[in-house]
């Protein structure tokens, strides 16, 4: 049975392939600077972050390649669907993430976009390194073995 989500946390977009392609070592929550039509479009539950990433742009951390569709009820005041969006973090967190990406070969990947209990749009970021092909195969084998083990224990018990 799947775990029940937090009552105040409504997930809008989920990057399920991120944990397959990257070995995530650390996660943190960041705010995201959005326009009004982007927020309304997110509340409709439509966003894609499968191919997006976060990276430095000057002194800030930006979310690149995240797709938030146009809000249909807005006419000429709509937003660009794949524009870079500023991530709202403390300076110490920004410096840590930029340092890890530049010096140690890490990548900052968005894992989820959700609304918290106060109705603010947040992004869950993961700091990780890319997996090689043999690491991905090993992850699949381990996941299959865990499923078989759980199935055997459930059938015996």
From Swiss-Prot:
Taxonomic superkingdom: Bacteria
Keywords: Cytoplasm, RNA-binding
Protein name: SsrA-binding protein
Annotated source species: Methylorubrum extorquens (strain PA1) (Methylobacterium extorquens)
Chain intervals for the UniProt region annotation (Disordered): 131-157
Keyword Cytoplasm found: yes
Family: Belongs to the SmpB family.
Gene Ontology CC: cytosol
Segments traversing the membrane: none
Gene3D superfamilies in UniProt: 2.40.280.10
Compartments it resides in: Cytoplasm
Function: Required for rescue of stalled ribosomes mediated by trans-translation. Binds to transfer-messenger RNA (tmRNA), required for stable association of tmRNA with ribosomes. tmRNA and SmpB together mimic tRNA shape, replacing the anticodon stem-loop with SmpB. tmRNA is encoded by the ssrA gene; the 2 termini fold to resemble tRNA(Ala) and it encodes a 'tag peptide', a short internal open reading frame. During trans-translation Ala-aminoacylated tmRNA acts like a tRNA, entering the A-site of stalled ribosomes, displacing the stalled mRNA.
GO biological process terms, semicolon-separated: trans-translation
Biased composition (Basic and acidic residues): 132-157
The keyword RNA-binding is assigned to this record: yes
One Gene Ontology molecular-function label: RNA binding
């Amino acid at each position: 049975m799947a775990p029940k989500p937090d009552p105040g946390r409504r997930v809008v977009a989920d990057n399920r392939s991120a944990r397959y392609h990257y070995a995530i070592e650390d996660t943190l929550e960041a705010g995201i600077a959005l326009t009004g039509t982007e927020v309304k479009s997110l509340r409709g539950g439509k966003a894609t972050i499968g191919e997006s990433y976060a990276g430095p742009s000057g002194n800030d951390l930006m979310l690149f390649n995240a797709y938030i569709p146009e809000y249909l009820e807005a006419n000429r005041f709509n937003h660009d669907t794949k524009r870079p969006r500023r991530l709202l973090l403390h300076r110490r967190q920004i410096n840590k993430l930029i340092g890890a990406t530049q010096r140690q070969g890490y990548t900052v990947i968005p894992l989820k976009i959700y609304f918290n209990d106060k109705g603010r749009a947040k992004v869950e970021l993961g700091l990780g390194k890319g997996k090689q092909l043999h690491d991905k195969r090993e992850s699949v084998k381990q996941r299959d073995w865990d499923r078989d083990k759980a199935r055997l224990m459930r059938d015996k018990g």
